[in-house]
Amino acid sequence: SGRMLDVLVGPAGAGKTTAMNALLRAWEAEHGPGSVVGLAPSAVAAQVLADDLGIATENTAKWWQNHLLYGTTFEAGQLVIIDEASLAGTLSLDRITHLAQDAGAKVLLVGDHAQLQSVDAGGAFAMIANDRDDTPELVDVHRFTHPWEKTASLELRHGRTQAIDSYLAHQRITGGAAETMPDAAYNAWRTDRDKGLISVLIAETHEDVTELNRRARADLIHDKTLNPDREVELRDGTAAGVGDTIITRNNDRRLRTASGRDWVRNGGVWTI
């Protein structure tokens, strides 16, 4: 485009990663290996980007800290991909794009402004995408097996209430009293697990999450799936031992895996 800042918009499952891989190959063919770097608002998202594209990545806050402390910056001819850009604060994006411009690099913001927004003051990604007449947007969703799911996901993205009717018609939503739904959700999760399916149990409050985790762990101990002989107490008062799955809630680069290549990230999922 000739611009130093471009955007790529796409709903979940539309092929943004595939598009970025194609762009990576084309850019490196012209500018050389290692000329594409990646950033993302969270450490987990940055790691996903690194795994998907095979490039060096960092989260935006850490990169900015490295810039302030060590003078880290960009190089002329580099392509800086900022993934999940709708989650990045406007000030963060402004700082990074100005540094890229000064260095002669190009920035590509990738994401979906119809999904979650930044915790910080945000909206820059949506503003740029909506302000331009030639913003590229991926519109075909490839992630789902059933055609109705593709349509419903896009309706949900655009805030169209008929999406709810689709999910109800296909028995994807179950309603009930607040007192009974935790039991219903837990039993559905347990049924899936007993069938060998991958199932995720999500609750609205920390209290509900803690209680459901206690219940699930007690059942797994009863089934002898878990051994409670050696365990440690977690922050919410629950316990964990060998075989348990936990989620870490802070970034701590001092806590590394045995290989030394991976470290504890906020939102990281681990098996003890």
Predicted regions and their residues:
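Conserved helicase motor core of P-loop NTPases
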Residues: 1-3, 23, 102, 110-271
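ASCE P-loop NTPase helicase motor core
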Residues: 6-168
